[in-house]
Amino acid sequence: MKRFTTATTDIKKRRILRVVPVLAAAGILSVVLTGCGSSDEEVQRYSWPLATASPEDTVTQIFAEKFAEEASDLSNGKMKIQVYANSTLGGDRDLLETCSDGDIPFVVQNTAPQVSFMSDLAVFDLPCVFDSLDDCRKKIDEPDFYSLISDVYTNGGYHLLGMADQGFRVMSTNKAVNSFADFKGQKIRTMENSYHLAFWKALGANPTPMSFSEVYIGLQQHTIDAQENPYEVIVSNNLYEQQDYVVETNHLPHLISLIVNDEFFKDLPEDEQEIMTEAAQLATEYAREQSDARIADKIATIKESGTEIITLSDETRKEIREASKGVYESIREVIDPAIYNSYMDGIEE
């Protein structure tokens, strides 16, 4: 492990001093630096914050914790990363802003809230692109596509270290969906995302943006008929208790990015950058494995409750894709053509 140069050490000290008020205000200050500005014989040790807006028992948190663990192991304990969950350091938007400023170097979060900051990430809002998670992961890992997406993050002030997932987003509802016509009129809660709203409108549904904290009561009081989320969210928040069906629309992958402030990353010695990259690769593989196992477990929980899981026919999926062409065109108009073409390469349009 290389020792920091004086310039690099000064940068790190300044950054840690900047983040101290943020952590202190939250009552969780744990950043530690020893050996700063001391003799060459002393060892540099440091603890950097990594923040998520997700609860602890989620793939997002598993991804974050595994990255921190691997970074520590690969550096023989010299690189310490402290993970803070449950929006302790802020919500999704807050975390993106503080990461961009360099106050919190690491963030793990879903790509959806990042579209407001980096419009090219709307490529991940293209509906019903993949037939399987394996196909989706192969595309994400494809060198040419990954390079293009990495550039998007770099231009936004971040460095993309890895991208895992929480499976596909699926629909839960109190009205069975066995054909395309069955989507018509369903009051479904969505995120406040124009492309998501347009997708459900194209299916004939009645999408309603709603705070996630209101979804359970909305289903209970029949303000809404349905909602859409990954299996993990549906089970961990007990949404299936208020629903008769889960429909495997698999309309979007729920992608989880691991990002670091770009300037912060570039200031690291080369060997530490390599450790970060390797740790992220290992964490990505682990998070995907955990996601698959947890999805199977969540499906079992839903079935045991009596809620029926409906798998759509190829014909219905084809109708959904056909109805979504307007969404494709809307997204295609606002993102880099190279990104769109790379993402859709090998996909029948």
What are these regions (language model features)?
Residues 1-47, 349:
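Short, low-complexity disordered leader/linker segments with a strong preference
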Residues 2, 37-136, 153-155, 159-349:
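N-terminal secretory/targeting leader peptides
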Residues 31, 144-148, 195:
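Transmembrane alpha-helix boundary/anchor motif
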Residues 134-150:
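A gly/proline- and charged-residue-enriched helix-loop-helix capping module
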